[in-house]
Structure formats: C-alpha cells, structure tokens
Amino acid sequence: MSELNTKTSPATNQAPGPEEKGKAGSAKKTEDEEEEIDIDLTAPETEKAALAIQGKFRRFQKRKKDPSS
C-alpha cells in the first residue's frame, strides 16, 4: 500500500543539490525514528470516526462544487 507524505514538497523527491546533502541525511534519520501506529480497522470507534470524516468531506466537496448553498 502506498502512503502519501504531505510533509515533503515535490522538490524533495529530486536528487539533492550540494547544499542539501546534509539535510537529506538528517531527513532519512527522522523517518526511521518515526513510530508506526497500528489501528484496528474493525473497532466500532474507528468505523464511527471514518463515517464522520467521510460525511464532513462530502459536505466540503458539495460546498466546493456549489458555493452558493
């Protein structure tokens, strides 16, 4: 499964320039230290939260499509 990383800009996917080589090494270090969170997708709280998020997103899309309402 692919994950979207919203923390990095598209420019960071390119090869680093001479001044960015030090940054690339430290960025890799923080990614390795990141904690992986295991979410139970069958839990009732998770399903409830997902439905709430989906509902808000649908309302947002509807308002975005028809700003007069």
From Swiss-Prot:
Keywords: Phosphoprotein
Family note: Belongs to the PCP4 family.
Region (Disordered) residue spans: 1-47
Record domain IQ: where: 46-69
InterPro entries on file: Calmodulin_Regulator_PCP4-like (IPR052142)
Protein name: Purkinje cell protein 4-like protein 1
Compositional bias (Basic and acidic residues): 18-31
Modified residues (Phosphothreonine): 8
Biased composition (Polar residues): 1-15
Gene name, Swiss-Prot/TrEMBL: PCP4L1
Disulfide bond positions: none
